[in-house]
């Protein structure tokens, strides 16, 4: 994404998608396939689908209603975008109903113990995925698989499939969904490698509280994003913890192993994470902020263009520069006020990528855990199987998003100085990059 041609969302929508959107618009004009996003209608549909009525409280209602308002008034969704949004909201509501029903019938789920988790807290594109997937190679940690992050709650058919020795229907659903995503947005694979069974972050679980940045990545919803930034999201994190218990219960995980958590959203909601897990061990990776902003803008752009043709790269650039700046400020404030030194550890992206064994040894020393030979071998195996750029190089330019590299550097200099983060090129204001 480094040509002189101005980026346009429509150029990223494949011809079959354009034809499908055209057909759906025609159907909508005839009163068919309008994909109603009305919250009350979606709640009623979830209840009808499951035969259940208890969502486990109403903390999700305000963010869901605000989300729908932003989708209707700001996102300018195409018909496919409306369909995807409706399907996503209905899936989340359905899972909440199944989750509440499950803990009522199986109180042992809530009784499960959870050791203090290890949480990777860093900006998107700062090495958090690489770090999590390396550490998840160590069998002494619990981690999510991609399909579990989408469908964390087993529904009746899942139990039936397991009893009959058949594949979990959630796995089949995610495999089909990933194929569709990679067809519609093939460039995503170079940004964030996707696989049904790959280690994945828990932002999909936070989404079940309707308080997640995932919605921001797929639609232009600034009003919802501002609410998310400025309101406490403890309720969503509490529900995330419940879902982790459900997943562990269904897998019959040992109760003495800690979860390995990771999500860039923790930068924004570190206060909520610590409300739920006050003694979590935080691992905080840091990368050249100029690179982070450019890579983040490209990541968001490649996702958001699927569902709207009117979003502009300049809007993405300004929104995510501002968001990055605020997330950094907020996380630093929370760390200074609420996290004791023995519970936080800083590591540079450069160290993770150039000498991963040394970086990992420092992390394990901080955790007070041995970095065993078996864990090292497993980590090296993951690296050997996941060479950088195997899905294509992720290319981007700040100028594609209307951003001046010097302005980005000036606004985020406080962060670079705080952690002595090195520049990733000899010219600190070089705008074109990979990764």
Task: Describe each PLM feature range.
Residues 115-118, 256:
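Pre-Walker A (Motif I) flank of P-loop NTPase domains
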Residues 253-279:
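Flexible, glycine/threonine-enriched loop-and-boundary segments that flank and lead into catalytic domains
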Residues 1-101, 219-238, 244, 248-251, ...:
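PAPS-dependent sulfotransferases, especially Golgi type II membrane carbohydrate sulfotransferases
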Residues 137-147:
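Post-Walker A helix-loop "phosphate-sensing" segment adjacent to the P-loop in P-loop NTPases
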Residues 120-138:
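Glycine-rich phosphate-binding P-loop
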Residues 150-259:
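PAPS-dependent sulfation machinery
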Residues 101-111:
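Pre-Walker A adenine-sensing motif
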Residues 273-298:
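Conserved phosphate-donor/acceptor-positioning beta-strand/loop module used by diverse small-molecule
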């Amino acid at each position: 994404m480094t040509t002189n041609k101005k980026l346009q969302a429509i150029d990223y929508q494949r011809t079959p998608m354009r034809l499908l959107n055209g057909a759906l618009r025609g159907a909508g004009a005839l009163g068919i396939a309008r994909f109603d996003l009305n919250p009350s209608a979606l709640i009623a549909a979830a209840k009808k689908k499951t035969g259940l009525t208890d969502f486990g409280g109403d903390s999700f209602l305000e963010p869901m209603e605000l989300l729908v308002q932003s989708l209707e008034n700001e996102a300018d969704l195409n018909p496919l975008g409306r369909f995807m949004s409706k399907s996503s909201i209905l899936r989340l509501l359905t899972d909440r109903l199944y989750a509440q029903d499950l803990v009522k019938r199986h109180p042992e789920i809530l009784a499960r113990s959870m050791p203090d988790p290890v949480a990777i807290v860093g900006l998107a594109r700062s090495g958090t995925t690489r770090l999590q997937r390396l550490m998840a190679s160590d069998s002494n940690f619990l981690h999510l698989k991609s399909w579990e992050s989408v469908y964390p709650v087993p529904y009746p058919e899942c139990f039936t499939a397991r009893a009959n020795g058949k594949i979990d229907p959630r796995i089949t659903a995610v495999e089909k969904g990933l194929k569709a995503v990679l067809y519609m947005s093939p460039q995503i694979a170079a940004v964030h490698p996707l696989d049904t069974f790959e280690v994945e972050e828990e932002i999909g679980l936070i989404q079940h509280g309707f308080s997640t940045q995932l919605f921001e990545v797929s639609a232009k919803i600034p009003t919802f994003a501002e609410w998310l930034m400025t309101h406490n999201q403890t309720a969503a994190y509490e529900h995330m913890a419940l879902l982790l218990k459900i997943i562990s219960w269904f897998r019959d995980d040992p109760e003495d192993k800690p979860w390995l958590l990771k999500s860039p959203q923790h930068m924004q909601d570190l206060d909520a994470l610590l409300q739920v897990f006050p003694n979590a061990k935080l691992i905080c990776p840091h990368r050249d902020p100029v690179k982070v902003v450019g890579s983040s803008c490209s990541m968001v752009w490649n996702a958001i263009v699927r569902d709207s043709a009117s979003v502009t790269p300049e809007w993405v650039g300004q929104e995510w520069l501002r968001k990055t700046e605020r997330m950094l400020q907020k996380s630093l404030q929370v760390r200074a006020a609420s996290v004791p030194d023995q519970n936080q550890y800083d590591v540079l992206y450069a160290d993770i990528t150039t000498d991963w064994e040394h970086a990992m040894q420092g992390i394990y020393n901080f955790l007070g855990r041995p970095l065993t030979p078996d864990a090292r071998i497993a980590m090296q195996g993951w690296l050997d199987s996941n060479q950088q750029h195997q899905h294509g190089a992720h290319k981007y330019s700040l100028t594609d998003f209307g951003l001046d590299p010097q302005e980005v550097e000036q606004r985020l200099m406080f962060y670079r100085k705080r952690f002595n983060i090195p520049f990733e090129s000899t010219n600190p204001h070089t705008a074109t990059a990979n990764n």
